[in-house]
C-alpha cells in the first residue's frame, strides 16, 4: 500500500442483501465492472472482522462490513481517460460525464474527477471558485452519467452560478423507475434534508429545503417506467429521494430502496439516471444554448434487454 492508496471501510446497505458482492460493490462505490474485477483479483476486498478475503460471488448479508483498498494506479488509469467534450469555447466546456467520476476532489474520494480529466486532456480551467472546485458550477453524483457544464473563465463562472441560483438553467434527466408511474405526468413537491439516522443518505423531511421535481412517463415496460424529469430545484440526490418517497425507486438505486434482483437482472451497477439535456444563457452572448447527450452503453443495454423481453 502506497501513500496515495486509500483503504475504505464500508457497511453494506440493507437494500443490497442477497446481491453478489461484486455487483453490490460497484453500486456502492460508483465504479466500473472492470475496476471491481481488479479489486477482487488482487485480494483487495476483505472482511472487516477477520481480514479474510471476500469472494466476488459471496452474497451480501445485513450488517456485513468490509474493507476495500483502492489503489492509486487504478484511479490514475481512469483519470487519464478522456471525457467526451460536447462543446467548448473560451468561456465554457460541456462534457458527458461517465459514471465513476466525481465532479471535483473531496476528502475521502480517491477516484477520478471531471476537473482532473479535463486538465489532463489539456483543457484550461480558470482559477475561479474554491481551489478544489475551480470551474465547477453544478454537480452530478458519482453514479450518475450525463451533461455537466464547467466554467473556463471568471465571467462564465459568475454568470452560470447566478443562473443556477435563480433557476434559469433547464435540467432534463431520464430515469428508469420501478413500477408504473400513476399519474403518468406529475410533480413531486417535498422538502429534502439529510436522513435523520443515516448520514450518507438524504430523505424527505418536514423541516428540509424546498424541493420540486416534475416528471412525465415516456415509455412503460413490465414493472418499470422510463421517465423524463425536469428539476425545478437541485438538492443532493433529489430525484433519487423523491422517487423513493413516492414508492418508485430508480432501478439499480440500492441506497434508496431499489429491488436488487431487478438491478441484477438488468445488469445495473448504479442508479438508472442520466442527465440528458442542459439549456442555459451563454455567459458571453446572452443567447440560450441547448445541449444533449445520448445514453451510455449500460443504460442502452438495459433498455434493449427490456424491449427484447417484450418482443419475446
Residue ranges with predicted function:
Residues 1-187, 191-196, 297-307:
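RNA pseudouridine synthases
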Residues 50-55, 223-226, 264:
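Short alpha-helix capping/helix-loop boundary micro-motifs
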Residues 55-59, 228, 270:
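Short, surface-exposed secondary-structure edge patches
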Residues 66-68, 196-199, 210-212, 258-263:
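Short Pro/Gly-enriched beta-strand edge/turn motifs at strand-loop
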Residues 85, 177, 214-217, 250:
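Conserved hydrophobic positions within beta-strands
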Residues 130-161, 169-170, 174, 189-246, ...:
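The conserved catalytic core of RNA pseudouridine synthases
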Residues 166, 170, 174, 178, ...:
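Flexible glycine-rich active-site/ligand-binding loops centered on an Asp-His dyad
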Residues 251-283:
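RNA substrate-recognition surfaces in RNA-acting enzymes
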